[in-house]
Amino acid sequence: MPFVPKKQAFNAHINEVVLGVGDKATAIGGQNVLPFHTFDAEIKNAPKIGVELTDLGMAEYTMPGEKAFYEGCTTVPEMAKRAESLEGASFICLHLEGADPNGLNKSVEECVQLAKDVSDATTLPLVIMGCKNIEKDTELFNKIAEALAGKNILVLSARDENYKTCLLYTSP
């Protein structure tokens, strides 16, 4: 007896969002099926692959392959430029873990400048990931969204406490 798959009902719609600007802009979402359920219906935009970079630089990369790939890079923007050459990379995710008040407690201004420098160094869309401290992330996200207005960045880790103020700068 042949196998006949039963289609899953998914009554919601995942909105399509365009990250970045220019030739390397990439769209995510846009389907009305459960994630990865291509057997139920066509998925408009295939899943994308991002390269995560930390603001802590090369000190955090301990795997031999990572060290070899980023060899010669001395700054995070240089690493972003190198990551752009990875086959299949659709976006850069900048993780600002050095901003954590319980860690290095980098200043908001320093993180904003780094985000600008990374954005200038690469043509790939930029995703910003905070330090997981609600108060610091609120300030970080607002300042970075303001500084990179018009670049269609994605702010990860936004919570109910802080996402609405970021929308002021990211909406067209």
Where does each model-flagged region fall?
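Conserved, mostly hydrophobic/aromatic
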Residues: 83, 144
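Alpha-helix-loop-beta-strand connector modules within alpha/beta enzyme cores
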Residues: 106-126, 148
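N-terminal basic/disordered segments at the start of proteins
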Residues: 4-54
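Structural preference for beta-strand elements that scaffold enzyme active sites
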Residues: 46-50, 90-93, 125-127, 152-154
